[in-house]
Amino acid sequence: MDLSPDELAGVVDLFGALTRPELKTALVELAFKQSEDPPDESLIDTAIESYHLVKSEDALTVGPTAFPVIPDGGTDLPHIMDIESRKVDRDRLGRAVEERFRTEAARAVATEDEEAINRLIDVSYDLETWGPVELANARELLAD
């Protein structure tokens, strides 16, 4: 089964937040519904790296670059898995994601990784819209 990062975010968005094992179970259930093999777990890591999903303590939630799309059969997952919708503290999550962003930005600047710098500049705008963070200074550093 091939899922885009936005579809993976759509699965998580159905619940508000999922632990990694719960997300893996949801993907197995979704694959079963579609008569396909579940996606490789690396899809989750790729979605985290691209800020489509972000870690919140021990759970994953929809990240700033995601435009969640519910994949075919996805709307049945809350009933199949019997997991209540969860709320995430957006302020605390925003601070955690900001810290991760600033660490990645510093690393990209130190290694002069132009691809990472350009990607992080784009992410900074999404992150400011998504959470209560201000990244103008970090963006200036990246642009310089």
Identify the function of each model-found stretch.
Residues 34-36:
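Short arginine-rich
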